[in-house]
Amino acid sequence: MPYRKVISGSKYPRINIGYKKAIPGLNTKADYDLATIQMDDNIQMGLFGTFSYRAMAGYFLNNKTMYFMDYKHFNGNQTVLANQSYLSSFKLLPYYTYSTKNWFAEAHGEHHFNGFIFNKIPLLKKARIQEVVGGHVLFNDKMDQYYELNFGIEKILQIIRFDYALGYGPYGKFNHGFLIGIDAEF
């Protein structure tokens, strides 16, 4: 009789429902209620690689007394260094510009081809580098929409990732840039 539990995953996405309450009087004057829902999953697509996504939406049910640090802030980036949390961050979004105390919805998706394309090119196959494509979107009361696409090469020397990102934001503003990331935990 086995004495261990083996979790083999699920074919269904993971859903998290959250609620956050700031109670005034406990050494603070903040008073707000935030309800959130998040869904994420990794979908194995055989030879075509893996598709991963994370979507989150939230609404401040009460925002009676809030300070800027209590707002919902989105993981942005204004440097050439990529955030390791690829499925919860934007590549080109300015810091704090679109932070909100009302409602929001964001979604991130990436497809890792796991060599599906590059393995057909002899020198690239030998280098074991892999291709990745991603998309990111943000909606909230501060703007109509913000979109990003990124195209990258990962597993360079097993730990380095290069991305080229394109962003399209409010008022028809385009942005683009290169990013470098390291997939190693120190």
What are these model-derived regions, one by one?
Residues 1-186:
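Exposed, low-structure sequence patches enriched in small/polar residues
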